[in-house]
Amino acid sequence: MSISIETITKRNQYRVDQPQRQPSRLSTVASISEYQSDYSKTVFEEIELEVIPNKQNISTRSFRNDGNDSDPQTLDPDAYPPKRSIAFVLLNSILSDMSMSTALPISAAYTEILGGTDAFSGLVIGIPTMISLVCLYPMLRFANPKSANGYTLYFRPLIVSCISQIIGHLLYSLAYRAQWLYLILIGRMCNGVGFTMFLYHKKYLTDKHFVGQNRSTFLATLNILAQTVGFMAGSFLGGLLAKACMHLTNPIWNQYTVGSWFMLFAWCIYGILLSIFFKEIRADGNDSSARKPENFNGQAVKLSYTHKFMLVFLSMVAFISYFNIAGYQASVPIYAKELYHYNAFQSGNFLSLSALVIAPLVFLSTFLSKWAEDRDMMLYGFILGILALVVHLVLDVLHKVRVQPYFVLYSAMQFGFSIGSAPLISLATKQLHPKYHILVGIIVQIGISAADTVGAICGGAIFDITTVGFIALNLGIAVLVFIQLLFLWNSIKTKTG
């Protein structure tokens, strides 16, 4: 748009004299917008400036400048990071869950042949997430250096996850050749270093620096879908490859190690592609999909008692949801072997078929975020999970747990608690000041990591605890957090999206 000299002269007659400003660091476009805004205040107050989307279909940042450049810059509610970067994060989520679940169908048999017990098998399944919890703080320091100016450098934990997963799967596969039981555990502990990415999956897809409020719940639910797909694929491949190599006697490549070798190759390919194509969002001001980290002008922002209680509540929701999920997943091969005489291949098919049923339901639930609040999704998910546990408990007491109802109840419970825990980070980022967003991610991840470890151990020892005791334990803690949800109902109301 061209502006004639006469027009500018007329405009200057109406402008209020202002002290001369120093050149701003903002772009020329932002400066023109500021000039038009000042002019519209004096003469054309009815004129509104339209935000024009850029080439990436992400609206340019709108600035509010009251003479103080430190004011926070607002982000378009529909903004999102580069699509290829979202794809790499979701693919990492899928591969991480595959690494977690590939060992499920064969873990009990693998540990038994090397002299281990069912409880040790549960430890092998659950120990990686506990290691990820221990490595969480060093990874936070590594991914958030001072040079990043408040941004998280997501490429760093992504590449660390690749390297640690490759090493972990290598050691796990060589345990049979070495005939050393604890090498399985060491390999899974190396996998645990890579599982610190479980925090960054959620954080990247809800990061307020470049994810708009209308996109956060949708992307967070997509992550749950990715986890479901990864678990389905890992369980199926673990059982299928074990069956295909059942008669092999090679100490390197056999039914116990083939799934781990497969994942090693998959992580190598992913790491190469990640290094070439992943696009990092940096604090250089050139990427219009991001906003600058906010300057809080030194003002202390304290949490209210309600917000503190909410943080405790979110951690409990994460713990109890994943305790149920991980506990049942670890118990399926043992429970089904005792009741239905399932082998590793059949157990893997059971787990993967359940995930296959859940996946489209999780996908459909991603669209609910446009109409349903985060608290509504949590409520419906927990109601479904609790009902499934109640029915399973009754059938188990009556000794009438046939395989078909067990499959339906297991799938309903998994789906319910997956959806119930999906909007935790999104809910917190909508409620709390951005200063506390990293803290929220850490608290939720602590709950998840502890639950994955403790739940897997309890699931592996299901017959030591007794089946009734195990189901009742899951039901009791789920009811506890459900009561807390009702107590906090009015305090966690948020916008949809």
Curated annotation (Swiss-Prot):
Superkingdom of the source species? Eukaryota
Indicate what this protein is called per its UniProt record: Uncharacterized MFS-type transporter C613.02
* Keyword Chaperone in record: no
Q: Which Pfam families match?
A: MFS_1
Q: Which residues cross the membrane?
A: 86-106, 120-140, 155-175, 180-200, 222-242, 258-278, 309-329, 348-368, 378-398, 407-427, 438-458, 468-488
Q: Which InterPro entries match?
A: MFS (IPR011701), MFS_Domain-Containing_Protein (IPR051068), MFS_trans_sf (IPR036259)
**GO biological process annotation, one example:** transmembrane transport
One MF term in the entry's GO annotations: transmembrane transporter activity
Q: Give the record's family classification.
A: Belongs to the major facilitator superfamily.
Where is the segment annotated Disordered? 58-79
Q: Name one GO cellular component term.
A: membrane
What is its membrane topology? Answer: Multi-pass membrane protein
Q: Give the chief site where it resides.
A: membrane
Give the location in the cell: Membrane
The alphabetized UniProt keywords are: Membrane, Transmembrane, Transmembrane helix, Transport
